[in-house]
Amino acid sequence: MDQGHIIFRVLHHENISITMDAGVSLFFGLHGQYTISTAQENYTIGASEVYAVSPFTLYRTVSGEDAGVLQITLSPEILQKADWPQRQMIDCYLSRSTLTDSVAQDIRRRCATLFRLYFQQTDQVELQRQAVSLASLLWSRFSTTDSVQPEDSINTLKLLESALKMIHTQWNQSISLSETAAQLYVSDSYISRVFKKYVGTTFTKYLVDLRLSHAVNDLKGTDSVTEIAYRNGFKSDNSFIDFFKKAYGCTPGKYRQQLKQSADTPEPPKEDVSDWLQELLQYADGASLYSKSAPTVIRKTVRLPETQDGEPICQSWRQMVNIGYAHDGLIGSVQEQLRRAQKEIGFTYLRFHGIFDDDMHIYQENEDGSPWFNFAYADLLFDFIQEIGLIPYVELGYMPSKLAKTQYTVFDNPAICISMYNDSEKWQALVQACLSHWIDKYGLANVRKWRFTVFSMNYSRLQYTAPVMSHEDYCKMFEATYQTIKMIDPELKLGGAGCFPGIALAPDGLRRFLLDVKEHGCPPDFITVQCYPHEDFSQDSDFFYFTSKQTSMPSVLSKDKNFTLHFLQWLNRIRQEIGFADCPVVVEEWNSTLWQRDLSGDTCYKAAWLIKNVLQNYDQAEYLGYWLLTDFLDEWLVPGGVFHGGYGLFTINGIPKAGYQALRMLGRIGERKIASGEGWFVSRTENTIQVYLYHYCHYDALYRYRYQKLTDPHDAYKVFEVDGRLKIELELCGLDPGVYRQESWTLNRSAGSAFDKWLEMEAPRVMTPEDLNYLNDMAQPLCKIRDADTAGALHLQTELEPHEVRLIVLKKRDG
């Protein structure tokens, strides 16, 4: 990855053939052992060890078992700015024995800080300043008086570099020593001597080895040995086989068999590259990450209409909220959090997984295999839901183990079984029995308000669930469910298919599902999706270059700050194209991350993310179902302590997080939108004006790609792009003259964030009931009230910290 004449490259199981750089390359050991060889020496570097290769020095790298190293290359332009003497060489090898040496530690710190600054989108000036400082330290402390390369030696190396470039670009063509020498205007014997001296082998041997390395990779595919031979520049398959046997000790065919056997034998999971990079990042400068530059300024004049004109606001974010599983809804602390949320925010629907899971005990079988049904636990749940004024949004899943075709779960909880049914008639009997029971108990008119779905189609597409069910299986399940429900009552509503964005937008994803079930007479009554801003490596070509040979998380957070808006706009285009324009969209799950242990989600970041995304997307879908209300999620072992980075608006102890307080603020929104822009939104209800201000800062690339682990709660704010304060000036014109009561509600690290109050308490892991009560009481936004006298215009001016949100409510006083 290249930025400002600085190149970062993570090498993982990757060998570099003979090469050289015009600048200086530093190799920082991350994991295992890597060997860097020059003409003078071989250096094996392990974790936290550093070796620097001088400019115009030939080197090669060889990876040890499960090894990783970070290469940082500083360009000649950087060296020049550092006053690096021309042709100056250095001798810098920092073993682990130098961990107590101040200069060596300074080199490590500068490498780590430079790496982190790049990923935090630091401006070019600061990035280059740090790089120049590192280069200056290298030559001033590690150069020697006799370490200057002769000019003629540099010219020879440049010639060799040109020859190597020709070989590496024409290796699969007819290329020879004579042709290469002719193109470089030197003799055959001269090129031959240079190769022998600097590369340590002959021109022909180097070319054959390069061709073999490409051929080995091709043997992983299905092409014939003959095709591979000619594709890689060998004159015949016999020539290829002879060279291959000399190098690898077996024929290409035998080698391919060994590859297949190796692929069929599963390997235990290895450490993530993100774990390795902690070896580097532990040395990063811990200084404040917030910019000290002048604040960004937004100035806007907003003219209020004389009438109640304006775009109506649909409070789609209050239409639905999620808890994890049906069984979770029977837990006292979860019920208390639901009661509080209903009182302070007021949602319409409650969604959850697992109504058919074994721990709800609905599906039972007699000894002869005939089904019977037990609704004791389900009745307790649905009675409670309706008691607190919520409407059930019932996901029909997962699969009861006795009805499962495959016993499979991706979670720690054995009650969760993800599978196709083993008997269509029994599945339909289960669905019919449930619907009939609920209609008998709660009344048809009531149940018609409920919403039903089948569990997500993601499980038919995600790689780790490939054996569980196919696309065709999923469509059959949906169609069987649809027919059963509509047979009971045509006005009951069934939606699908709950796809992640990548699956929803894929040609063979949601589009295919909708067309297939429509063709069979089972079109969903509403379209459901799950919106997490994740993308594949291949969708980010810039980073793909950096990590193309790495192992990391299979999904990364999108760099698109407006991911939700763009995803829903694309989804609406698809609906139009395939004849589903009138079919409502429900975002049944929605969060800033798919990671269940993301401490940044406990911070003020989540408040700014929610305010920004709700105000951008409230009109893009009928429901925006936040995932989820509580940190209590019985998929994995529920961690101890108060804050662990769970999805919830509440901790498991019932402490409201900053995101919850943001939704409370949104509950004050007006009936109509007046105007909006990046960082601000103005609404109105009769003679009351609501102004929302927010300073959203996105994750930096280092964290988006999971190259920054977040385990220390004190580091939770170190994973965002470096940004300063935001100054917003709004001129509200067209107000009725008079005195206005001005309420100002502020949510930032000083007020409204339980996480930051917890940090102030020294982040205690064990908290008494009194401690929790104190934290709950202190986790309130700051409120200031004053009177503002206006002759028809009001000037609002404020500065926001990163992740800060504010609500200003203006209400004209009577008289």
Regions found by a protein language model. Give the residues of each.
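Short, Lys/Arg-enriched, Trp-marked, Pro/Gly-tolerant hinge/linker segments that flank
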Residues: 93-102, 120-127, 136-165, 169, ...
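Noncatalytic carbohydrate-binding groove/subsite architecture in carbohydrate-active enzymes
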Residues: 470-616, 620, 642
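A hydrophobic/aromatic-rich effector-binding and dimerization subdomain
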Residues: 1-5, 57-122, 135-146
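Basic/polar phosphate-binding segments, predominantly the helix-turn-helix DNA-binding elements
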Residues: 166-168, 173-210, 229-251
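Short, basic, alpha-helical segments at the C-terminal edge of helix-turn-helix-like DNA-binding modules
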Residues: 154, 207-220, 254-269
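Short acidic-glycine-tyrosine-enriched beta hairpin
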Residues: 40-55
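Generic protein-terminus/edge-of-domain signal
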Residues: 1-44, 239
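Non-catalytic accessory regions flanking glycosidase/transglycosidase catalytic cores in CAZymes
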Residues: 239, 254-395, 402, 406-451, ...
